[in-house]
A protein has these predicted regions:
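Short, structured segments at the rim of ligand-binding sites
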Residues: 1-167
Length: 167
């Protein structure tokens, strides 16, 4: 949404309406994006386009915010800018993000999970690869794996034994 010059509304239902979205109110305006929120909660109205700049973000809140910024910076053609991160809690999820970004031709230098440096990126809102198989979710498979351990042999497909998933 932050890449679009048109205003885009984001909403949700249930518990999503109570989740804090202050991150967007705090960070996106620093990147040239207009944000209207409901006191830091959904619904949000976002209007870009995002202009990548050197920023610092709090990584203790959620890796999802950093994941979105990493992809948005790449798609916007970030050049010679950094995202500095304080207290990143979910490194394995950032590894998944960087792995998928690389597969699609978007690369960023990861400097000890504290700084992500973008150099000479070309604006590319459309990744180069069209097909990608999303690996299975180890957390979701845990119950089936336990059932197999108790009841006998079981085969589960789609799980990557080399996955960087945290679970």
């Amino acid at each position: 949404a932050a890449l679009s010059h048109l205003p885009i509304s984001l909403t949700g239902t249930g518990s999503l309406l109570t989740r804090p979205m202050d991150f967007f109110d705090e960070i996106l305006p620093k990147l040239g994006v207009k944000v209207l929120s409901n006191k830091g909660k959904l619904p949000l109205q976002i209007q870009g386009p995002l202009q990548p700049a050197n920023i610092e973000v709090d990584g203790s809140l959620s890796s999802q915010f950093l994941t979105g910024l990493l992809m948005a910076y790449s798609a916007a053609g970030a050049n010679d800018v950094t995202i500095a991160v304080k207290e990143l809690k979910s490194k394995p999820y950032i590894d998944l993000t960087l792995q998928i970004m690389k597969h699609f031709g978007w690369e960023v230098d990861n400097i000890d999970y504290k700084t992500f440096f973008f150099r000479n990126a070309v604006p590319n809102p459309q990744p180069k690869t069209t097909y990608y198989t999303i690996e299975g979710d180890w957390s979701g498979a845990a119950f089936l794996l336990v059932a197999g351990a108790i009841a006998g042999p079981i085969t589960i497909k789609g799980l990557d034994t080399c996955s960087t998933q945290a679970d």
